């Protein structure tokens, strides 16, 4: 016969094991009645979202409010994973230019209000000054900051730094990535004006050795677009995909058709990022491309000091352009969440799976008469515009436009 002592021990052990599960049922924050769009998990319906310890605990219909410490009613609003912007310049500092400079932007000033929870800096730092970038900006920001490491050692520190082939060292870039694998997601080539393909080849070698994607920003006449795409591997990313500048052939030909070699690159698995910026997005390229099936894989904004005050403005504005150009809202959200997460090999991001980090955007579609401007000063008109109502970063509220989470003032 089993002794009473053994039974007591067994019961105590069971209670010990069950206790954490019972405690975990207490919900820190419950988003009720929102329309969830989570492309990875194929959710597109009214759902509740429960958050515990900064992570997604449950996404389901009618989660009881009784165990929730805080409840936010998202009725009439959309709920999605936090948006991911894969082309930004956020190595802000006091120097002229971009690297540690005044032309970069402090990310928290512009991300939260746009529903953006993750940004990827596009080569503003190189292997020489990345540690400064990490200490000065990355580690001190609420926004998650990832990085495409510039093949140039000093990154975007000015023309002389960008032109120094001797400083474009694949081994040094590789060792930097090995040291910071949680932050550096790829290699960047861009802003080189020489006649040699060496920088491109060095960047590609660094990306291959590190098993990361290459972000290509080469709008130079000596780097023909077709040759760039031919050198790129499946999973590599070309940005400023829909620009119309004299320095680089556009993706649309004189007859208004997507060039055949561009279609082949798309079939090969090359990814196309918007990279809007101040000069990287033209309706004359983007609209026929969209109609002919050349869709962007991501809505990189090319966030910097000048683009925020021009036609780009913010990521929501870029997304709104595509919504008004005819892209379905579900496809827009895919390209702002799960698709960019996949492109940078961070599949822990961009979705609301159980256990995932609770980076969340709660947003609305405003109805009205709106104008949208491209890099050439051309305008289209639309009747819908995305607006961020609430942004959560690791389960914490970092933006609340209309006080959804606030207590009502009583006189």
Predicted regions: what they are:
Residues 186-309:
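Active-site core of metal-dependent hydrolases
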Residues 284-369:
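His/Asp/Glu-enriched, well-ordered alpha-helical/loop segment
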Residues 26-30, 36-82:
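Histidine-rich, glycine-flanked metal-binding segment
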């Amino acid at each position: 016969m089993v002794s009473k002592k053994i039974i007591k021990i067994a019961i105590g052990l069971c209670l010990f094991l069950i206790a954490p599960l019972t405690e975990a049922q207490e919900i820190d924050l419950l988003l009720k009645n929102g329309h969830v769009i989570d492309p990875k998990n194929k959710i597109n319906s009214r759902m509740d979202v429960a958050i515990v310890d900064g992570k997604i605990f449950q996404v389901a219909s009618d989660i009881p409010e009784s165990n929730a410490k805080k409840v936010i009613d998202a009725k009439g609003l959309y709920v999605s994973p936090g948006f991911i912007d894969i082309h930004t310049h956020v190595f802000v500092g006091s120097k002229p230019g971009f690297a540690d400079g005044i032309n970069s932007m402090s990310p928290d000033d512009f991300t939260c209000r746009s529903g953006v929870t993750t940004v990827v800096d596009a080569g503003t730092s190189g292997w020489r000054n990345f540690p400064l970038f990490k200490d000065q900006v990355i580690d001190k920001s609420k926004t998650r900051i990832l990085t495409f490491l510039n093949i140039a050692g000093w990154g975007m520190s000015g023309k002389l730094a960008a032109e120094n082939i001797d400083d474009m060292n694949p081994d040094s870039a590789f060792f930097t990535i090995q040291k910071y694998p949680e932050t550096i997601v790829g290699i960047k080539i861009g802003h080189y004006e020489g006649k040699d393909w060496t920088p491109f080849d060095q960047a590609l070698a660094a990306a291959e050795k590190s098993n990361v994607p290459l972000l290509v920003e080469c709008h130079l006449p000596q780097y023909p677009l077709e040759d760039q795409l031919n050198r790129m591997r499946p999973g590599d990313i070309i940005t400023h995909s829909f620009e119309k500048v004299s320095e680089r052939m556009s993706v649309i030909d004189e007859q208004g058709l997507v060039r055949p070699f561009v279609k082949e690159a798309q079939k090969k698995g090359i990814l196309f990022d918007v990279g809007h910026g101040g000069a990287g997005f033209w309706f004359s390229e983007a609209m026929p491309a969209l109609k002919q099936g050349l869709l962007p894989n991501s809505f990189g904004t090319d966030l910097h000091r000048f683009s925020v005050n021009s036609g780009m403005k913010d990521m929501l504005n870029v997304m709104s352009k595509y919504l008004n150009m005819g892209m379905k809202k579900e496809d827009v959200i895919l390209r702002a969440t799960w698709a960019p997460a996949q492109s940078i090999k961070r599949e822990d991001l961009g979705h609301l799976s159980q256990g995932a980090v609770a980076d969340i955007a709660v947003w609305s579609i405003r109805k009205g008469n709106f104008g949208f401007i491209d890099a050439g000063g051309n305008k289209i008109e639309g009747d819908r515009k995305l607006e961020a109502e609430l942004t959560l970063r690791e389960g914490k509220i970092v933006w609340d436009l209309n006080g959804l989470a606030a207590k009502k003032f009583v006189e």
